[in-house]
Structures are given as C-alpha cells and as structure tokens.
C-alpha cells in the first residue's frame, strides 16, 4: 500500500467536495477546482475526510494511488489557503512593474517584456525587484513562475536574472587571464 496514498485527506470546514463519477470538485472560500480521477482509482468520502483507494496492486494502480491523493490534497489546500511563489530579480537595470493585472519586465533586452496573468493567477509587486505569483492551483502557480524565470534565467557567472526567493545559484569562476 502506498504510504502517501493510504493517508486520509482531512476536509476543513467551509470546503465542499463533490464526487461525480470520475470528477472530484472542491469548492472553498478562495474558489473552485476540479480534477478527473484516472480509471482504477476511486475517491470516497468518509466521516469528514476523503479516502483514495485502488482496486488492485498492479503497477499502474500503485503509481496512480499516491499521485491522485496528492493532487486532491493540493486542491483542498489551494481553495482554503492558496499557493504563492516569490521571485526576485537580480541585475543592474532589471526590474518589474505592474500594468493592471499584468506585469512588465525590463530584463536587459532592447524592449520591455510583458507577461499576461492567466485565469486564476494574481501578481503582487512588492518592490521593483521582487514580486509574488498567487493562485489556488499549485500546478498553474508553478508553471507561470517557471515561465517568468525562463525569461532571463540566472547567469552562472554574475548571478543576474530572475530567480525564486531563496534559490541558490551555482556560480562559475570564469576565465583567469594571464
């Protein structure tokens, strides 16, 4: 039995979960998320918590068991607390500014780089070199953060670029000269 998959998912008050066929829908104070559960896995509600079960011990069922439990647990956390990622910009002249609900970056290119906020994502600019990506869908928050980081990845020689808060950038030494 999967150590992660067998753990029940606690359902906090204020969260409404409906299981219709293979679709699990989670409604909470921050919004609504839904997920289609793959065939052999079943999600059942028992005494104020959700239990994810699998019918057999086949390799596919075992691999999907823990995954499904974690995805549903992330949905419950998302609609109650939400998710956020803080990113920092390092480099002379590199900055970010809010343009309505979107962001505009100056990253050393000859033009500003606009980033539109997808549905369910909210940006918060704390300083010109620090901003936060907020949302209820953990996967979407991570995807948007990774796309923004990819606009100018941290340089291994000088460390300039967009990085996650607390990310350690491995630095290279560079040429030694004569």
UniProtKB/Swiss-Prot annotation:
Can you list the GO cellular component terms from the UniProt entry?
cytosolic large ribosomal subunit
**Assembly description:** Part of the 50S ribosomal subunit.
Which NCBIfam families is this protein grouped with? Answer: L6_bact
What the entry lists under SUPFAM superfamilies is as follows: Ribosomal protein L6 (SSF56053)
For molecular function, the Gene Ontology terms on record are: rRNA binding; structural constituent of ribosome
Instruction: State the organism named in the record.
Output: Frankia alni (strain DSM 45986 / CECT 9034 / ACN14a)
The protein depicted here goes by the name Large ribosomal subunit protein uL6
Q: What does this protein do?
A: This protein binds to the 23S rRNA, and is important in its secondary structure. It is located near the subunit interface in the base of the L7/L12 stalk, and near the tRNA binding site of the peptidyltransferase center.
Q: Name one GO biological process term.
A: cytoplasmic translation
Q: Gene3D superfamilies, from UniProt? A: Ribosomal protein L6, alpha-beta domain
Q: Where is the signal peptide?
A: none
> Of which family is this protein a member?
Belongs to the universal ribosomal protein uL6 family.
Q: Which UniProt keywords apply?
A: Ribonucleoprotein, Ribosomal protein, RNA-binding, rRNA-binding
């Amino acid at each position: 039995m999967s150590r992660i998959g067998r753990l029940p998912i606690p359902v906090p008050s204020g969260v409404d979960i409906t299981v219709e066929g293979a679709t699990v829908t989670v409604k909470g104070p921050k919004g609504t998320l839904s997920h289609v559960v793959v065939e052999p896995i079943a999600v059942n509600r028992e005494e104020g918590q959700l239990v994810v079960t699998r019918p057999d011990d086949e390799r596919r069922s075992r691999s999907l068991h823990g995954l499904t439990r974690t995805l549903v647990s992330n949905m419950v956390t998302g609609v109650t607390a939400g998710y956020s990622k803080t990113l920092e910009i390092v480099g002379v002249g590199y900055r970010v500014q809010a343009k309505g609900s979107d962001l505009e970056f100056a990253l050393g290119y000859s033009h500003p780089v606009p980033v539109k906020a997808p549905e369910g994502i909210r940006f918060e600019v704390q300083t010109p070199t620090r901003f936060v990506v907020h949302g209820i869908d953990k996967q979407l928050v991570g995807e948007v953060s990774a796309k923004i980081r990819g606009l100018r990845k941290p340089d291994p020689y000088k460390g300039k670029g967009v990085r996650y808060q607390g990310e350690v950038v491995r630095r290279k030494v560079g040429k030694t000269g004569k």
